[in-house]
Structures are given as structure tokens and as C-alpha cells.
């Protein structure tokens, strides 16, 4: 049995990269997407979501980046927006169903601690809400 966060990180990675397992029967995106990963606090977002997706809680640990659900060779390291240990925005290589690179998906990390305004005004393809965010 795998954990909820690990399982969700795998699915987020598939949507970001377009690299779906053959057995997957859920929704498939046929284009690069915008995905938000939203935690309760910045700290929990980094320690859970960032760690599961990128493989490390520390954005400064370049050797560990790419050891999580998102494959290292899909991460655009030149356009990885960081703030200390936090990854804020990442560009992830997306591939079509034939395996051809067709653009870059965007992943953004956010927290509800920043206020509900950070969740307004954007058209987003996929949102991972970690834990129960509503009372």
C-alpha cells in the first residue's frame, strides 16, 4: 500500500509530463498544463508536496532534485524559480502520446496561509489540495 501523498504526486507527475502508464484509465491531458500544488502552510507545502514531487525539501539540493515523482530529465533547471529552500514555480517537459516533446507544463506551489486571494483569478488545469483545507 502506498501513501496518499505519494500516489497523488505520481498522478501529478503524469499530468505534467504527459508520460502516463499504459494501465492508467483516468483523464489524460494532451497538452502542457498549469498545475497548482496547494498546502496549508508554506512549510508543509515544502515538506510534503515539494518533497514528493521533486525529491527534496531543499530547493538548494541540486543533486536530490529529480529524485521524486517528477523525473530529473523532465525538469527545466534553467527556469526553476526558487526562494531559498522553496520551489515556487517549475517548468516541466511535456510529451505527446507519441513521445515527442511538445512544450512545458508549469507547476506552482502555493499555501492557503498566504490567503484565499492566491487561489483567485487564474485558469488552472489541475490542482492538488493537500489535506482538508476547509473547516
Regions found by a protein language model. Give the residues of each.
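Phosphate/NTP-binding elements of NTP-utilizing enzymes
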Residues: 1-135
